[in-house]
Design a protein with these regions (language model features):
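Central regulatory/effector-binding core of bacterial HTH transcription factors
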Residues: 62-125, 193, 276
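Short, small-residue-biased leader/transition segments that mark boundaries at the very start
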Residues: 1-12
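A late-sequence structural motif
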Residues: 77, 227-271
Length: 279
C-alpha cells in the first residue's frame, strides 16, 4: 500500500507540475532540472510567508533584516548604516553578512539575505539594482614608494609595478582588471587578500601599489601616510548599489534602508590628489 500511494503521489506531481520535480535513486531524492527551476521561487515564497507572518503576528515586537555588504562597503559604511537603521527602527534586529560581490549575489538569489549594498556588478536579471552612493577607486602609494612624491603619473608607468589586489569575485578587482586589459598593462600581482586593511598595510609597509576605494583611506590621506592618484578619465568612478530580489516582499526596514543610503550619497574628496594620466 505504501508503494502504491507513493506511486499515485508521483503521478499527481507529474500531472500538476507537467513533469517530475524529484528523481528517486535508492533511498535518496534528487532534484530534476524542473525542480531546480522551481527551487529559488519556492524559497522566496517561504521567505515572503515568514515575513507576512512576522508583520501580522508580531506587531510591536522586534523585526529582522538580513543585510549583505561587500567588503569595501562593510568596512567603511555598514556599521554606520546599521546604527542609523536602529535609530529609526529601535526594535530592528539586524544580521550583517560581509563578503565579495559574487557571493552576495548568490545569497540574494537563494533568499538567504533580504537586501545588500554592493560595489561590484550584479549579473542576474532576477535582482533589482539601485545605484545610490558615489564612490571612486584611487591608486595608493606609501611614503617609501617612488610615486609618493610625484604629482602626475602616466598610465604606462604602472607596467611591471608590484600591486596588492583583492581576491577573485571582488567588484574592486574586476573594475581594476578591466582597466588593465583596456590599457594593455602588465602589472605584477605580489599580494592578494580579501581584506581592504591588509591591502592598505601592504601599501604602507611593503612598497606595494594598490587600487581601492578612497573611502577606505580618509585617515591615511589626512595624515599623509599615503598619496592617492585619481583617474583622470574617470574610469574608476562607480556607485554603491542597493540590491534585492525582484520578488522580494519589501518590508519597512528595506524602505528605511534605501532612505538612509541616500544620506551617504556624496563622496568627500581630499583637497590635494595626484593624477593618473591617460595620454
Amino acid at each position: 500500500d505504501r508503494l502504491r500511494s507513493r506511486g499515485l503521489g508521483d503521478v499527481y506531481k507529474r500531472q500538476h507540475y507537467n513533469g517530475l520535480l524529484f528523481e528517486r535513486l535508492g533511498k535518496k531524492l534528487y532534484l530534476t532540472e524542473r525542480g531546480k527551476l522551481l527551487l529559488p521561487h519556492a524559497r522566496e515564497m517561504i521567505r515572503q510567508f515568514q515575513q507576512l507572518e512576522e508583520l501580522m503576528q508580531n506587531q510591536g515586537q522586534s523585526s529582522t533584516l538580513k543585510l549583505g555588504s561587500t567588503l569595501t562597503v562593510g568596512t567603511c559604511l555598514t556599521p554606520s548604516i546599521i546604527l542609523d537603521l536602529q535609530k529609526k527602527i529601535p526594535d530592528l534586529d539586524v544580521y550583517s553578512f560581509v563578503t565579495n560581490t559574487q557571493n552576495i549575489e548568490q545569497k540574494l538569489l537563494r533568499s538567504e539575505l533580504d537586501a545588500a549594498v554592493v560595489e561590484g556588478e550584479i549579473h542576474s536579471p532576477d535582482l533589482v539594482v539601485l545605484p545610490i552612493i558615489d564612490d571612486c577607486l584611487v591608486l595608493a602609494a606609501g611614503k617609501k614608494h617612488p610615486f609618493y612624491r610625484r604629482g602626475r603619473i602616466h598610465v604606462q608607468e604602472l607596467n611591471n609595478q608590484k600591486f596588492a589586489v583583492r581576491e577573485y569575485g571582488s567588484g574592486t578587482r574586476q573594475l581594476f582588471e578591466d582597466y588593465t586589459l583596456r590599457h594593455d598593462l602588465k602589472i605584477r600581482t605580489a599580494w592578494e587578500a580579501n581584506s581592504p586593511r591588509a591591502l592598505l598595510n601592504a601599501v604602507l609597509y611593503n612598497q606595494m601599489l594598490s587600487v581601492m576605494s578612497i573611502r577606505l583611506m580618509h585617515h591615511e590621506i589626512r595624515h599623509r601616510s599615503v598619496r592617492v592618484f585619481c583617474n583622470e578619465a574617470g574610469e574608476w568612478n562607480r556607485k554603491f548599489k542597493l540590491v534585492y530580489h525582484k520578488n522580494k516582499f519589501l518590508t519597512p526596514a528595506i524602505f528605511e534602508l534605501e532612505k538612509i543610503l541616500h544620506t551617504y550619497q556624496q563622496l568627500e574628496l581630499p583637497s590635494v590628489m595626484g593624477v593618473l594620466e591617460q595620454e
